[in-house]
Amino acid sequence: MDQDVAEEILNKEYEVVYEGKRFLLKPAKAWVLQPPGKPGVIVALFKLPNGKTVRKVIARLPP
């Protein structure tokens, strides 16, 4: 990931739905997951107010 793109992803708030509740959170960590021969996705870790950590796909990369 380009440095500017990575910084933009980490500073943006995303809507995370967990157990029927919606949260607007900034990711704690994000990375690209791209299996060979398939389009990739950007996965992020979010820390919920109750202390749990959840993963969510926040973007899809072009093939």
UniProtKB/Swiss-Prot annotation:
Its main location: cytoplasm. A chromatin protein, binds double-stranded DNA without sequence specificity. Constrains negative DNA supercoils. The gene is creN7. Belongs to the Cren7 family. This is Chromatin protein Cren7. GO terms for cellular component: chromosome; cytoplasm. It comes from Pyrobaculum calidifontis (strain DSM 21063 / JCM 11548 / VA1). It comes from the Archaea. It is found in: Chromosome; Cytoplasm. One of its GO terms (molecular function) is double-stranded DNA binding. Keywords: Chromosome, Cytoplasm, DNA-binding, Methylation.
